[in-house]
């Protein structure tokens, strides 16, 4: 069940009204993954097939991917759950051995996927194409702000953050390039540290969204 108020796979259930309990899941995720247990550091999660469609080269490619610089330059944590292309699995293992703020589980673990959705502050999903996409909807439901590329279902379900008004439910990038992903994650991390009231309001807005989630899921199943 993808519902933070009823999810039996997370340590602490919560709603938009009790969103402070979300923090328990973050601390549990940090501890489980061997990260510094610190509520103040923004945690970015990704759950993905390690396939070209998902923008993995732009994140993880050894020569030009942005993951290494992101983790070196920004005071953030990065948790990865996924499996797929061998080169990418190997590169993630290399990154993990060199970066104390990047931790990964190569494979699939259903309970961990729920903990990442509940415990992350942001969810990275820079897909090359995404007809519908479910993870960004789970993220919104769990008050975990999506960082997505403007394509398909991602563009339809995530409203880009407006720094002036504080409106939005996530952070949207237009171009699938390492620099664009780096910049957009950096923007989210900046907002985390400097626009805390905006972030909290966005989480509330995300959790309360009614955009036909069930209908979208049904359409996805039909496809």
Stretches with model-predicted labels:
Residues 1-223:
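Catalytic cores of carbohydrate-active enzymes across secretory and cytosolic contexts
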């Amino acid at each position: 069940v993808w519902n933070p108020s009823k999810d039996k796979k997370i340590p602490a259930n919560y709603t938009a009204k009790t969103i402070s309990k979300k923090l328990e899941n973050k601390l549990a995720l940090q501890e489980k993954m061997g990260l510094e247990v610190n509520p103040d550091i923004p945690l970015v999660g990704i759950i993905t097939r390690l396939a070209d469609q998902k923008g993995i080269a732009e994140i993880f490619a050894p020569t030009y991917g942005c993951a290494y610089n992101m983790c070196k330059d920004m005071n953030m944590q990065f948790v990865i759950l996924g499996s797929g292309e061998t080169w990418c699995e190997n590169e993630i293992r290399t990154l993990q051995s060199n970066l104390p703020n990047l931790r990964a589980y190569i494979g699939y673990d259903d309970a961990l996927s729920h903990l990442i959705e509940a415990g992350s502050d942001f969810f990275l999903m820079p897909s090359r194409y995404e007809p519908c996409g479910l993870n960004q909807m789970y993220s919104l439901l769990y008050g975990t702000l999506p960082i997505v590329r403007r394509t398909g279902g991602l563009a339809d379900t995530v409203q880009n953050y407006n720094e002036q008004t504080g409106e939005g439910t996530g952070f949207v990038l237009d171009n699938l390039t390492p620099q664009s992903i780096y910049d957009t994650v950096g923007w989210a991390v900046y907002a985390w540290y400097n626009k805390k009231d905006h972030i909290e309001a966005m989480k509330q807005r995300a959790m309360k969204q009614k955009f036909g989630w069930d209908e979208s899921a049904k359409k996805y199943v039909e496809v």
